[in-house]
Every structure is written in C-alpha cells, then in structure tokens.
A protein has these predicted regions:
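ABC ATP-binding cassette signature C-motif
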Residues: 1-226
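Flexible nucleotide-interacting loop at or near the entrance of a catalytic core
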Residues: 2-4, 8, 21, 218-285
Length: 285
C-alpha cells in the first residue's frame, strides 16, 4: 500500500447510544497510510466506540466508515475470551492466520520481544499466565497480525519501563498506520505525529499535526483564547442587559429599544464558546 494512500475514511458519520447519548455528529476525516496518531478526549467520551466503528463492531446511524479495500485492522484486546483461556500459546496465536505459518514460533518470539515478554513453552495454556502476562500476550496478538491499521487502547498499562521502551521501538519502526489511546504522554510523544481530538460537546473530531506535546500546547492556546473571548462577551452581555432594564423602566418608545438590547444580549449568549470539561484535563495528558 502506497504511503500517501488514504487507509481510513469517515464520511459524515453520526453515531449515538440512544437518543440522549450522541458520540459523533456528521464527522468526516481521513487517515493516510503510515500515520501514527493519538486519539484524545475526555474519559468516557466515546474513544473506544470510535475503535469499534473502525473494526466494524458498531454501525453508524448515518454516514460511512471505510477502510482501504485491501486493508486489514487489528486491535489490542483488553481481556482474553473465556473460551480461549484453555488455548496453548501456539493455538492462541495461530488463530490470527488463515493459513498455517511454518515459522509461527519465530513470529511469536518477535512480537513477545516487542512487549518485553520471554518466550514461553508453546504448549503452555493461556490461563497459566498472570494477568499482566496475559495483557502482554493480548498486545502481542495484535502485533503479530501485521495489520494495515493497528489500534491500541492504553497499551502501556501493564508494561514496565523496559517494556514500554521495547514497544516504543517497535512502533517507531512499524511502517503502517497506528491509532492509539493512552494517557502516557512521553510514550505518545516518542512516536506519534498527530492527534484526532474527540470533542465531547460538539461530537466532532478535530485533526492536529505535530508531536504530542506541541499539539497539547496548541489546544491549550485555543482554549485560553476561547476563555478570553467569553470573558469579553460576558461583560458586553451584562452591559446590554443593564441598558435594557434602564430603557424598559422609562417606558414608551424606549421599551422597543430595551427589546432590541435584550435580543442582542441573547445573540451574544449564543456566540459564547462553551468551555469544554475535557479541555480542563488536558494538562494531565
């Protein structure tokens, strides 16, 4: 797949969980092959739902989510399915291939190295591993598929410092597309070069280019500008309302002037930029 090809496209996508919980409203964006992007937003705002839309596990109410017709997608799962806990290591990884892989042991060893996990016996059962080891095996199971789009949700949660370093090195050299959700700013800054920012209030996605820290600073500057504009509008609105009250009390033709003042105040209210709750959390990323 050529480097400049669009591998993922959202076209006027709207999705909601019930009438009162919209996630996306007419969202459009495109991701090119080889992009490494952070998906940013407030906790619980629908980032995981976005991954499910890409995987085809959820269907939008309107619009279209499309992956390049030859493209493959894999995600680092959070838990091993109950019916797979009795699988051996070899069986667990073999299920991700449609044909027998004669070099499967080497492929397994390579992806386990990427998550800093020593190669176990191939006949060891998945339920014999600790929770942290299972998390690494799940992450490795996404890597072994060598997908065109790799989706990672908090991949560093069960990794120590050395494990994060191994994974970072792997992702830097990975030539395909990576979308990642993570609160580990240093990890994100090491290999991503853009952000898809999910706005919980407008239910849209904003695209930013640059390393993680630069993008966070850009968003913070935008927020500060919006806050400053809101302060100015609040002052103007208050003045217009005070003037409207004065004119209304004088009666006669001045009541019409008072009404115009109130209408102007309402219009200014609509122009205010809503302070996003998730924006307040940006310094924590």
């Amino acid at each position: 797949m050529a480097k400049d090809n669009v591998v993922l496209r959202f076209e006027k996508v709207s999705f909601e969980y019930g009438h009162k919980k919209p996630i996306l409203e007419e969202v459009s964006f495109a991701v090119r092959n080889g992009s490494k992007l952070t998906l940013m937003g407030q906790n619980g705002d629908g980032k995981s739902s976005l991954f499910k839309l890409i995987m085809g596990e959820l269907t939008p109410q309107n619009g279209r989510v499309s992956v390049d017709h030859n493209g493959t997608v894999a995600i680092g799962r959070q838990t091993i399915p109950r019916d797979q806990l009795g699988f051996t290591v070899e069986e667990f990884f073999a299920q991700f291939f449609t044909e027998k892989q004669w070099n499967l042991p080497k492929l397994i060893a390579d992806v386990l190295d990427a998550v800093n996990l020593s190669m176990p016996a191939l006949d060891k059962k998945m339920n014999e591993f600790s929770g942290g080891q299972q998390a690494r095996l799940l992450l490795a199971s996404a890597l072994i598929q060598n997908p065109d789009i790799l989706l990672l949700d908090e991949p560093t949660n069960n990794l120590d410092y050395e494990g994060i370093a191994h994974l970072t090195s792997f992702l830097i050299s990975y030539e395909k597309t990576v979308l990642v959700i993570s609160h580990d700013a240093d990890f994100l800054n090491a290999f991503t070069h853009g952000v898809l920012y999910l706005d919980i209030h407008t239910h849209t996605i904003e695209q930013y280019t640059g390393d993680y820290y630069d993008v966070v600073e850009e968003i913070k500057r935008r927020i500060e500008k919006e806050q400053s504009e809101n302060v100015r509008l609040e002052r103007t609105i208050r003045d217009k309302k005070d003037q409207a009250n004065v004119f209304a009390n004088k009666g006669g033709k001045l009541r019409a002037v008072a009404k115009r003042m109130r209408d102007l105040a309402e219009e200014l209210e609509e122009n205010k930029v809503e302070l996003r709750r998730e924006d307040k959390t940006l310094p924590e990323f």
